[in-house]
Structure formats: C-alpha cells, structure tokens
C-alpha cells in the first residue's frame, strides 16, 4: 500500500471504498439481492394489499439508500477526505511524541506513517485482537487480507508495558472493536497506566449519531456514541483536551492524562 504523506492520498483513488466493500461483502450482496427479489415480486404480483405494497417499496428504498450511501460515505471518508493524508496528526497534537504506542485490532494502516511523521521518536505497535471478544466476520476478513504483521500481540486487559512508558497512544479506528463495556473500561485503565504524566491519547472513531445512521443504517450500532468515550475518559482519569470532526462521520478526540 502506498503510505505517502502530504497532498497525495495514502490510498489509491478507490482503495478505501474497495476495502469496505470486501470486508462487508455479505451485507451488500444480501442487500442488493433483497432489492431485486422484492422489486420483482412487487412488479409481478397483482394481489398485494396496497398498504403492504407501500411498506415493501419503502423497505426497498431504505435498503437501496443504505447500500449506496454507505459506499459513498466510505469513499468520502477513506479516499477523499484529509483523514488518510496524515498531515493533520502533527497539527492536532500539542507537541511531537517521543515514545508512542499505536494500537489496533489487526488492521494497521498507520504505524509506518507515524514513523515517517515523527522520525526522531521511538514507536511501538500493538495488536490487541481477541477472537472471543471480537467475533464479527468483517474484522476477521480484514485481518486475513492484512496478512502477517510486525505488531506485537498484546492482551488489552493487561499491557506488557511498564507504568508511564509512553507519552502518546494512537487509537485510530480501533477502540470500538472492544464490544463489551467492562472490557473497554479495563482497556482504558491500562491506557491510563502506561501513559506518562500528561500523556496524550489520540482517538479516531465513527460516532453512533444521526449522520452515521443516515449513511450506514443499522450498521451505525457498530460504532460507539461519543459520550461513551467521554465516560471512559472521565472514569479512568483522562480529560478531553480537544474534539474535532473530520467529515460529518468521524470524530477525533485528544485525551490527556490528569496529573
């Protein structure tokens, strides 16, 4: 993958869109088959009650809308926005990191970029994937496509790092993969433990909000509401320094360890 930094996107023109389609292809196939079957039934059947016919057409509309809108939104986010141009990261942080940790659940698209952005820093990458906690087929397909990784396998419940090891932790589209509330709380407690005094966490996530519902339909339940990240920060001794939208669908949060 091309991980260039700056004015050129870090992906090809449609790489992000293609990946989303590949990781979630059963949903798209099921959606388009449903549209075809229901539409054919409505056109060929004359005995359908008018109210049922209306409801079926409404259902077809929403399925078609979410199939198309989710792909358009994904293309916007992952291929056309500033997100994967990467230069926003140094400007969002108050200072360049010296010792950083990049955490993901098996799909690492940022560690090489971080090393380029911060050449004088010391960085480590951890893969916290847990097959029991993260059982969704899409993440399994993403990991299979990613192949072998140089990331260090870690248990998100107990990081293999000493207290206050890192001044910055990067969580880029990763934390939402921990689905259990109690597990997320343990995870954030570990983040707090390994952060140095006044250390920072850069969190990037979709939000479970109206914009993501409009684009992804019921799939927006895969995301966490922004208030969940605020709750976890408050619970574990972190404070939100800054929040920013990158496109209507993605929220960037900078958290700091309270002294």
Regions found by a protein language model. Name each.
Residues 14-33, 39-94:
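Class I SAM-dependent methyltransferase Rossmann-like catalytic core
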Residues 99-102, 106-158:
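Class I SAM-dependent methyltransferase SAM/SAH-binding core
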Residues 167-182:
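A short SAM/SAH-binding and catalytic strip from SAM-dependent methyltransferases
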Residues 184-197:
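A short glycine-rich, Lys/Arg-flanked "PGG" loop and its adjoining helix->strand segment in the class I
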